[in-house]
C-alpha cells in the first residue's frame, strides 16, 4: 500500500501539445498549502480562502523567475475530493507550463502520484466507496451519453445504496441467528419462514442487479459488428449509409474493398465499432486473398455478424457457404438492394431468425437494422431489469458469489440444518456484498482497481 502521509502531485488534465488551453496541476496532502505558498505569488496580496480562485504568478522559489501566469484554487480539508488539503494550479495548457509547475512541486516536497492515488485517498478517507471510485473511471472513459449517464448514477451512489441495504438485511438476519446460537434458552424460537422470506427478497434483488451486467459490459466495451458477404452485395454502401459518411469506396467492381474499413457509431447508447470487410470469394489475386482471409478472421472475432446478401441475385451457393462459416456467431441476415428487387423472393435457411430488409443506396431500413441489432445483443432479462445501473465485471462476480451463498442458505433452511450452517453461508454473502462497496476488501483488490485510473485522478 502507498504511503498516504505523503503530499502527492500530478497533472490532472490531458496533455495535448499546442492545443490545450488550460492545464491543471493538482496537489493533495498535509504539505499542499505550504508548497503552494512557496511557489504562488499574488500581486494584490489576496486572502487565501478555501474554494476561492486566486490570480497570480508561479515563480521559482530560488531564482524568482516567473514560470507561468495562473489561477490557484484551494480546497481545504475536509471539503475536498480526498478530504485532505487540495491545491490546484490552473496554468496555460500545452506541455511545458504544466510540466514545469509539476517539477517545481516535486522539488519542493511533493511526491509524484501514482495511477488513481487521488481517488484511492478519497476512498480510504471515506469520501467515496468503491462503486463510486469505479464510476469515476467509467465517466472519464464513457463512449456514449448513456454510458456517461450510468456512470454518473454510480457516482451518485445508485449502486452502493441498494447493496448496503441488502448487506444490512443479511447482517440483521445473521444477528438473529447467532443470538439463537448463543442465547437459545433466553429467546423465543426463530421464525424460519420469516427468515426464508427475507433471504428470498435479498436473493431476488441480487438477481435484478446482476441482470444489468450485460448492459454494463456493452456500455463499457462496446459492440464489434462485422459486415460480411460476397462481393457486390452492398456492404460498403451499408457502412456509408449507416455511418452517414463516405468511409468506404463504392464501385460496381468486385473486390474493391481489400482491407477492413472501420466506423465508430453509437446505437441506443451502445458504442458500436462497425467493420466493413472484403467480399468473401475464391480469389486469384494475392492481395485480395489476404483481404478475404482478414474478412473471415474479423467475422470470427466479432460480437455480431451482419451477413449481407442482395435481393437482386437472391440466396446463392456462395451466400450459403459464407453463412455456414459464420452460423455459430450471433447473426443478422441483411437483405440489401430492396429498391431493385423484391426481397420476398430471397429463400434463406429457416433457422435464421433475425432478418432486416433494406436499401443502403436509398438509406432505407437503417432504423430497422439498429432495432434488430439491439434486440440481438440485449436479452429479455436485461430489458426487464429496468434499473438505473450498469454493473461491471468485478461487481458482477461478487454478486454471483453472494447469490450462490444465498442459494445455499435457502437450501440449509429447507433441510432444517443447525443454525451454525445457516451462518456460514450468510457470512459469505455478507462478505461478497461488502466487497462491492469496499466495506470488506483486500489490498490486492484495491491495487487492481485503482491501477486502472489515470495519474491525476
Curated annotation (Swiss-Prot):
One of its GO terms (molecular function) is metal ion binding. K(+) binds at residues 232, 251, 253, 256. Keywords: Cytoplasm, GTP-binding, Hydrolase, Magnesium, Metal-binding, Nucleotide-binding, Potassium, tRNA processing. Its EC number is 3.6.-.-. Residues 222-378 form the TrmE-type G domain. Binds 1 potassium ion per subunit. It is found in: Cytoplasm. One of its GO terms (cellular component) is cytosol. Homodimer. Heterotetramer of two MnmE and two MnmG subunits. Belongs to the TRAFAC class TrmE-Era-EngA-EngB-Septin-like GTPase superfamily. TrmE GTPase family. This is tRNA modification GTPase MnmE.
Amino acid at each position: 500500500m502507498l504511503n498516504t502521509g505523503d503530499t502527492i502531485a500530478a497533472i490532472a488534465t490531458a496533455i495535448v501539445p499546442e492545443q490545450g488551453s488550460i492545464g491543471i496541476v493538482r496537489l493533495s496532502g498535509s504539505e499542499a498549502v505550504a508548497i503552494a505558498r512557496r511557489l504562488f505569488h499574488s500581486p494584490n496580496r489576496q486572502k487565501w480562502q478555501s474554494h476561492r480562485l486566486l490570480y497570480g504568478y508561479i515563480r521559482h522559489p530560488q531564482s524568482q523567475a516567473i514560470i507561468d501566469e495562473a489561477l490557484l484554487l484551494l480546497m481545504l480539508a475536509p471539503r475536498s475530493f480526498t478530504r485532505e488539503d487540495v491545491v490546484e494550479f490552473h496554468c496555460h495548457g500545452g506541455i511545458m507550463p504544466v510540466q514545469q509547475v509539476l517539477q517545481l512541486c516535486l522539488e519542493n516536497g511533493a511526491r509524484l502520484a501514482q495511477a488513481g492515488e487521488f481517488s484511492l485517498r478519497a476512498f480510504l478517507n471515506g469520501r467515496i466507496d468503491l462503486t463510486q471510485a469505479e464510476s469515476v473511471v467509467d465517466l472519464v472513459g464513457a463512449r456514449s451519453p448513456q454510458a456517461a449517464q450510468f456512470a454518473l448514477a454510480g457516482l451518485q451512489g445508485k449502486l452502493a445504496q441498494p447493496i448496503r441495504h441488502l448487506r444490512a438485511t443479511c447482517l440483521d438476519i445473521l444477528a438473529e441467528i447467532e443470538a439463537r446460537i448463543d442465547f437459545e434458552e433466553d429467546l423465543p424460537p426463530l421464525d424460519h419462514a420469516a427468515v426464508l422470506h427475507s433471504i428470498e427478497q435479498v436473493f431476488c434483488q441480487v438477481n435484478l442487479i446482476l441482470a444489468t451486467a450485460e448492459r454494463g459490459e456493452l456500455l463499457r466495451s462496446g459492440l464489434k459488428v462485422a459486415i460480411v458477404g460476397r462481393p457486390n452485395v452492398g456492404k460498403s454502401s451499408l457502412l456509408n449509409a449507416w455511418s452517414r459518411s463516405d468511409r468506404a469506396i463504392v464501385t460496381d467492381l468486385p473486390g474493391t474493398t481489400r482491407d477492413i474499413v472501420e466506423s465508430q457509431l453509437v446505437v441506443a447508447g451502445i458504442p458500436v465499432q462497425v467493420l466493413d470487410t472484403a467480399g468473401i470469394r475464391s480469389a486469384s489475386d494475392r492481395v485480395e486473398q489476404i483481404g478475404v482471409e482478414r474478412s473471415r478472421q474479423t467475422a470470427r472475432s466479432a460480437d455480431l455478424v451482419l451477413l449481407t446478401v442482395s435481393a437482386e441475385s437472391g440466396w446463392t451457393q456462395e451466400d450459403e457457404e459464407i453463412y455456414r462459416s459464420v452460423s455459430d456467431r450471433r447473426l443478422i441476415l441483411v437483405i440489401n438492394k430492396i429498391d431493385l428487387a423484391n426481397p420476398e423472393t430471397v429463400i434463406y435457411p429457416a433457422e435464421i431468425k433475425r432478418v432486416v430488409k433494406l436499401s443502403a443506396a436509398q438509406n432505407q431500413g437503417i432504423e430497422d437494422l439498429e432495432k434488430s441489432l439491439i434486440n440481438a445483443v440485449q436479452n429479455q432479462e436485461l430489458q426487464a431489469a429496468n434499473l438505473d445501473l450498469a454493473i461491471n465485471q468485478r461487481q458482477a462476480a461478487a454478486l454471483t458469489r453472494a447469490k450462490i451463498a444465498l442459494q445455499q442458505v435457502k437450501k440449509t433452511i429447507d433441510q432444517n440444518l443447525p443454525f451454525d450452517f445457516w451462518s456460514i453461508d450468510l457470512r459469505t454473502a455478507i462478505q461478497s456484498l461488502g466487497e462491492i462497496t469496499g466495506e470488506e476488501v483486500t489490498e490486492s483488490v484495491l491495487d487492481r482497481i485503482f491501477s486502472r485510473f489515470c495519474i491525476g485522478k
